[in-house]
From Swiss-Prot:
(3S)-3-hydroxy-3-methylglutaryl-CoA binds at residues 43-44, 129, 167, 171, 221, 264, 273, 343, 377. It comes from Cricetulus griseus (Chinese hamster). Belongs to the thiolase-like superfamily. HMG-CoA synthase family. The gene is HMGCS1. This is Hydroxymethylglutaryl-CoA synthase, cytoplasmic. It catalyses: acetoacetyl-CoA + acetyl-CoA + H2O = (3S)-3-hydroxy-3-methylglutaryl-CoA + CoA + H(+).
């Protein structure tokens, strides 16, 4: 039948396509949310309890979306002893736009110049916070297609989330995540298990090309987020049940079947509400709920309609309480980065994934299914899942990816706490200068983490030049990921279809290393 899947299609696909390595970057300073409450003159607990936020990372005028992505990509390549010639696709998901024509990806190509590798597919993808997930799906689709040449795909999700002075400002943050996608991965994408919902909505958008600030309809944004979750979860449940039925399993899928459940996190409290929302869906979908002890005390809500409950405080309170243990077991750990650094837009949900991988051992993760809900305003949303490999032995791919993130909490704790008035001054400086030509950033580079790329200048033609703060640490982790390429740091296997120049493992750049996105 035209358009149908061949019966032997899976035999043609690479095995266990998924996330091989993951790197996260956030700036070296933050503002304390409790102190920000005092500075803003709001009730104590409005940000820390009401939103669930403890700290909010931010960047000075020395960092922009290009520098964030340069930093996270080079850190990933160095930490995993990867050669730049082993990347065949590079795609960036971001909504932080500093050029309406030139992509962030094209700026990242400067890192590949010395290798001579220019045969790299992919470009930027944009739809609010969903662009990173769209880029991930494109990478997976490339590897599972006739276009794949045997090399890795690299996905970068990054953003600077800032808001005008007011109620939305404490929901900001900044960061970037790089994901290495390939076969034989420790975190495997479940094939055929994506529940997607797309819809037209003006819940959050950025129509002013001269401003970094969005226009936000807060109430509509929450409704869109939760309604998209309802629909995505419904589609996902139907698809996995169909798979199970083919295997002889006639059970309904519920939250209990996820080992972990992570979600896009504008702020932590909304993620807790989203898990309660999924629990409500399970409750309404269970034909035998009156006999299921997990739903004890919820009988009065058996006839509610999902579309009537988005702002029903009684429903919200009851199901948050009833799902609290599930939240603690499956979701709470994923909020480490969100709680400590804030919203990272496209990279938010992947920061949540990093948080889980950083806090559990390979043995605790092995064999688990991780649910992932990605949401971008406007709107685009998908709920999909990752299956963790069973191999948790020392030196395994899973062991390597968790080891690479074991310092996540210490990195968060190593940042500098900045007073709210200094934070406000930095926000005003960005507001006044982010769009300027012929501009030299005013802030010092001394406070940046080692190995951080930063903005040196913007010339009179808006061309941006960057440099990297020297790093004294050796980022390499011995053999690296060691899957598609050789385990030897000085030998790398490029695409089997194309011979490109070989490059030894990248060393930290010298202090004088400068790159530019201009054609000069």
């Amino acid at each position: 039948m035209p358009g149908s899947l061949p019966l032997n299609a899976e035999a043609c696909w690479p095995k266990d396509v998924g996330i091989v390595a993951l790197e996260i970057y956030f700036p070296s300073q933050y503002v304390d949310q409790a102190e920000l409450e005092k500075y803003d003159g709001v009730d104590a607990g409005k940000y820390t309890i009401g939103l669930g936020q403890a700290r909010m990372g931010f960047c000075t005028d020395r960092e922009d979306i290009n520098s964030l992505c340069l930093t996270v990509v080079q850190n990933l390549m160095e930490r995993n002893s990867l050669s730049y010639d082993c990347i065949g696709r590079l795609e960036v998901g971001t909504e932080t736009i500093i050029d309406k024509s030139k992509s962030v990806k094209s700026n990242l190509m400067q890192l590949f110049e010395e290798s001579g590798n220019t045969d790299i597919e992919g470009i930027d993808t944009t739809n609010a916070c969903y662009g990173g997930t769209a880029a991930v799906f494109n990478a997976v689709n490339w590897i599972e297609s006739s276009s794949w040449d045997g090399r890795y795909a690299l996905v970068v999700a990054g953003d600077i989330a800032i808001y005008a002075t007011g109620n939305a400002r404490p929901t900001g943050g900044v960061g970037a995540v790089a994901l290495l996608i390939g076969p034989n991965a420790p975190l495997i994408f479940d094939r055929g298990l994506r529940g997607t919902h797309m819809q037209h909505a003006y819940d959050f958008y950025k129509p002013d090309m001269l401003s970094e600030y969005p226009i936000v309809d807060g109430k509509l944004s929450i409704q869109c987020y939760l309604s998209a979750l309802d629909r995505c979860y419904s589609v996902y449940r139907k698809k996995i049940r169909a798979q199970w039925q083919k295997e002889g399993n006639d059970n309904d899928f519920t939250l209990n079947d996820f080992g972990f459940m992570i979600s896009h996190s504008p702020y932590c409290k909304l993620v807790q509400k989203s898990l309660a929302r999924m629990f409500l869906n399970d409750f309404l979908n269970d034909q035998n709920r009156d006999k299921n002890s997990i739903y004890s005390g919820l009988e009065a809500f058996g006839d509610v309609k999902l579309e009537d409950t988005y702002f029903d405080r009684d429903v919200e309170k009851a199901f948050m309480k009833a799902s609290s243990e599930l939240f603690n077991q499956k979701t709470k750990a994923s909020l480490l980065v969100s709680n400590q650094n804030g919203n990272m837009y496209t990279s938010s949900v992947y920061g949540s994934l990093a948080s889980v991988l950083a806090q559990y051992s390979p043995q605790q993760l092995a064999g688990k299914r991780i649910g992932v809900f990605s949401y971008g305003s406007g709107l685009a949303a998908t709920l999909y899942s990752l299956k963790v490999t069973q191999d948790a032995t020392p030196g395994s791919a899973l062991d390597k990816v968790t080891a690479s993130l074991c310092d996540l909490k210490s990195r968060l704790d190593s940042r500098t706490c900045v007073a709210p008035d200094v934070f406000a001054e930095n926000m005003k400086l960005r507001e006044d200068t982010h769009h300027l030509a012929n501009y030299i950033p005013q802030c010092s580079i001394d406070s940046l983490f080692e190995g951080t790329w930063y903005l040196v200048r913007v010339d009179e033609k808006h061309r941006r030049t960057y440099a990297r703060r020297p790093s004294t640490n050796d980022h390499n982790l011995g053999d690296g990921v060691g899957l598609v390429h050789s385990n030897t740091a000085t030998e790398h296997i490029p695409s089997p279809a194309k011979k490109v120049p070989r490059l030894p493992a990248t060393a930290a750049e010298s202090e004088s290393a400068v790159i530019s996105n201009g054609e000069h």
